[in-house]
Amino acid sequence: MSEEVADNAAVVPKSRPLTKAEKVQAAGMKYAEKKTTVFFTDSTIASNLDDFATFNRDQLKLGKVLGKGRFGTVYEVMDITLAPKQASDDTWLIEERQFIHDHVRREEGSGFHSGDARYAIKILSPEVMKDSGLFIQGIYDMAVEARVLSDIEHTNIVKCRAIAPVSPLQGAEFYLMMDRLYDTLHKRMSKWGKKQKRRGSLLGRTFLDKGGKKEEETHLKKMTCAYDLASAMGYLHNRRIIYRDLKPENIGFDIRDDIKLFDFGLATEMKESRLADPSDEYCDVYKLTGMTGSPRYMSNGTFSKLSFVSIFRFLSITTTT
């Protein structure tokens, strides 16, 4: 899919002049387009957006809000209306659209989470559309996330299933459809903490956790989460992709309770043009922007606004026991 910004005429009818807000959005789209072009110049991250099934926004029936970030809101997808097939449609994409349509909800009476939506979409929040600064950053983040997700695949990274048939820079019209997640590590850690307190009491040790089996199960789950998360981060680092916003709120669990890393708007790439000293063939230090991510979870260097990082620094993961 082309990432070029559509002409203003394609966004606003010619019968009336652009409003001030529309002019700001149009300028924001052009700025975000230039920023995105620079970001992906000489990139090894391929744009595979044309390989995804597409649905117009009006084909999707949305349900409740599942989550909300600084720029985007995530809704469950309750139903999809299929549009008439076009002669130019690729056979594989027709089949993919049909599959997503047929499996948009889990079967009633199937047991665990029966009738639930299988998919969720991420779109720009309404309030972001009204703020020029947030709008520019929001569509830029969506463009980065769309391209990154289109070119990565890992068991513990959320999978993109479909996209809108417009550029990510079109703002309100663009969305990413992904597998629905049911929990975050942030919420799970809170549950683990409460269970730990209950098991720590005399009553808990006597009746709730005979032989320490439940505590052992929880510890095993924590270690599995740490291992799977390290696997996902290792995959990204091998692709020279730096996630930059690792925190419990951006780590979820799917229907099978497998851990999934999501929200790639702040991801960046270690490419040769960012080398601190391109003339040094052994240089492993890259130029990056400081203060990117969530302050509470930033590394000391990032929080201190250091603009250099080595590709060989190790990821440290701490689990509570």
Task: Please describe what each predicted stretch is.
Residues V11-T54, G63:
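Juxta-kinase regulatory segment immediately upstream of eukaryotic protein kinase catalytic domains
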Residues E96-I100, F112-R118, I123-D151:
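Conserved N-lobe beta3->alphaC-helix segment of eukaryotic protein kinase catalytic domains
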Residues K159-F174:
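Short beta-strand micro-motifs within the conserved protein kinase catalytic domain, predominantly
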Residues Q170-T184:
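Conserved short submotifs of the Hanks-type protein kinase catalytic core
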Residues C225-A226:
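Activation segment signature within eukaryotic-like protein kinase domains
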Residues H237-D254:
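Catalytic-loop of the protein kinase fold
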Residues E281-T302:
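Conserved activation segment of eukaryotic-like protein kinases, specifically the C-terminal portion
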